[in-house]
């Protein structure tokens, strides 16, 4: 769907387009619905906002029965409930065009620096009114401060409530953004950390990424349980070939895995099915640490009964082998 958006300067400009199924995942993790107000502080080609708009429109069509009310709600979603900021002029134009082609919603795509030039207000029409954001989605430029966590800090500081889901280079959670992370957790709660497949951006970038999910405007309690999920196997097999139609194949229940991932983050361990205990781990983090956002299930090094039996079996086999060798050598000596 986004094949027309490819452009040659993406590496130079530090722009890596988000796959549409990942954009949809972020939107679901941020709990977007028809009444959400969604913003993105590094909009790129607006893939995340397109996914948000589609989620909002679908929810409206399911829950609103009056045709007139639905038409009004659809217009409101497109005109007032989406906001994006993009600094690069060339990419900004792609975002505008993308939103128009996907059904519009481009009213508040702004060509601004979200870190220095944005005051939290609508861009057009309601430019003196603050945008009441309650959902934040982001795939930031990883070369920015803290791998892009500075965008997260800025956006969350301007929100009064809601949820956020970001995909970012995982070093942001293990030291690269230590001080920023500590500041973020003074006012927001980390709900989940998801390790994504290493080949997620194959052909564009080889960085390891994580998704971090936050509850906004609620200080992180040291006793709060964080969900750590290893999503390295998301069910897709990826290649980097010229024929795009065969570059992404569902080889292991990908749709079901993405659905289960969302349920695990939103509702907890009772939804474990395709995932194993080793891929889902719950524990706490230290809000004063800032480097412990990428935990994984501890490896159990205790030997099992099966391990013990195998060790004994291997030892007895070795003893018998040595005895047989000794007997053979003795018989050879007697024959000389």
List where the protein language model places each region.
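Long recognition/docking surfaces used for binding and targeting
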Residues: 1-6
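Nucleotide 5′-phosphate-binding alpha/beta core
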Residues: 9
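Conserved S-adenosyl-L-methionine
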Residues: 12-138, 145, 162, 170-171
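A conserved structural/catalytic subdomain of Rossmann-like adenosyl-cofactor enzymes
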Residues: 117, 123-124, 128-336
